[in-house]
């Protein structure tokens, strides 16, 4: 292993239904496991899938989950096929069957910023560089405005009117919370650019 070697660690936490398996655990124990993982690896990503119920996902979000899925398909070709029999090849059952729009609205109502950003991979903010930014708290200078911009893109392109209204209000509220004046100005300019580009595309 060389001195410049680095990697990213991410855990996908899956519960086992106690009604289906003798060694399954209850929701409270699952939440404790997630909390222990967050304390043990504070900078690692933690993904909670749609295998968990809405109630479990909401609880674990507050314990430090960093990613959740929405409108997931687990069958072969599930995203490409709309046929009713497609789910017959599902790899596992889904507990949270809400649409992506419903998931985004739910997160907004809980006060979270739904982020579709993957810029840290494209920009090389991984491994030791990511850890340096995270431990110093400077990662927020990148992630906060990027989250607002990717949310804006989603709202303009795909969201229902209800979700768009709630999300737009959250963006305006969060924009003023960006501590750096320079970053705040750039974020505001890019948010306006996103809105203008969408308007022109719809003319």
Set out the residue ranges of the language-model regions.
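A short, structure-level motif marking secondary-structure boundaries and short turns
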Residues: 18-19, 40-42, 87-89, 145
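N-terminal/domain-start segments enriched in small and hydrophobic, helix-friendly residues
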Residues: 6-23, 120-126, 130-132
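Radical SAM enzyme core and accessory elements
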Residues: 58, 63, 72-201
């Amino acid at each position: 292993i060389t001195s410049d070697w680095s990697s990213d660690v991410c855990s996908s936490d899956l519960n086992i239904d106690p009604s289906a398996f003798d060694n399954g655990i209850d929701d409270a124990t699952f939440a404790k496991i997630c909390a222990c993982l967050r304390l043990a690896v504070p900078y690692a990503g933690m993904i909670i899938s749609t295998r968990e119920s809405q109630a479990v996902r909401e609880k674990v979000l507050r314990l430090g989950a960093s990613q959740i899925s929405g409108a997931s398909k687990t069958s072969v070709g599930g995203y490409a096929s709309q046929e009713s029999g497609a789910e017959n090849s599902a790899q596992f059952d889904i507990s949270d069957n809400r649409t992506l729009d419903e998931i985004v609205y739910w997160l907004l109502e809980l006060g979270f910023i739904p982020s579709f950003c993957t810029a840290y991979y494209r920009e090389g903010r991984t491994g030791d560089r990511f850890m340096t930014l995270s431990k110093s708290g400077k990662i927020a200078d990148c992630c906060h405005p990027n989250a607002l911009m990717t949310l804006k893109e989603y709202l303009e392109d795909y969201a229902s009117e209800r979700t768009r209204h709630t999300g737009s209000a959250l963006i305006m509220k969060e924009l003023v919370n960006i501590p750096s004046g320079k970053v705040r100005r750039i974020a505001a300019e890019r948010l306006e650019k996103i809105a203008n580009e969408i308007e022109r595309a719809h003319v």
